């Protein structure tokens, strides 16, 4: 009788364990780093609505390559700070230019976040404005463009 209860409990435990959704590894806090930060020159001939900002995510091994199109101050020079709490990634896009211009234009900018592992993530991007958090799944086949929504 005791043996059958142990076997039944073991069966239930294994079933529950197997049915859990796998989110991938949870990253250690602040284990990510940013590299290869670049931005284009002001693209004055590109017509872009102030509300049209996109984020393209591409996987390259443990590196998340990010391409952005966005509207910024004409003197914009990209600086990026990245941190994480578990699988929530916080990206702060800053203007490192000492020049303050009174105009705005469209820019292409990109950077890489190193230290990624396969799994489910939420990325929170902020800069000139705050955007709604974006959920995505990181895998070696990731290559997707998202429209960022203003929060």
Where are these regions (language model features)?
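Primarily secretory-pathway and cell-envelope proteins
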Residues: 23-89, 132-151
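A short tyrosine-centered beta-strand micro-motif
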Residues: 119-125
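C-terminal motif of bacterial Sec signal peptides marking the signal peptidase cleavage site
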Residues: 16-19
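Generic short beta-strand segments
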Residues: 67-69, 92-97, 128
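Short acidic/polar inter-strand loop motif in beta-rich domains
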Residues: 97-101, 128-135
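Bacterial N-terminal signal peptides that target proteins for export
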Residues: 1-7
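Surface-exposed coil/turn segments at beta-strand junctions on protein surfaces, enriched
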Residues: 59, 84, 102-106, 116-118, ...
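An anionic, turn-rich surface loop/hairpin at beta-sheet edges
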Residues: 92-114
């Amino acid at each position: 009788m005791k043996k059958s209860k142990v076997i039944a409990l073991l069966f239930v435990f294994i079933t529950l364990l197997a049915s859990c959704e796998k989110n991938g590894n949870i990253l250690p806090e602040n284990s990510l780093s940013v590299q290869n930060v670049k931005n284009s020159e002001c693209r004055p001939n590109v017509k872009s609505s102030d509300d049209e900002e996109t984020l393209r995510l591409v996987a390259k091994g443990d590196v998340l390559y990010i391409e952005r199109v966005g509207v910024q101050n004409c003197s914009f020079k990209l600086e990026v700070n990245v941190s994480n709490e578990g699988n929530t990634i916080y990206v702060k896009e800053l203007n490192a230019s000492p020049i303050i211009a009174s105009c705005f234009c469209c820019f292409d900018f990109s950077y890489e976040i190193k230290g990624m592992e396969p799994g489910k993530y939420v990325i929170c991007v902020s800069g000139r404005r705050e955007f709604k958090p974006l959920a995505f799944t990181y895998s070696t086949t990731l290559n997707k463009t998202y429209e960022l929504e203003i929060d």
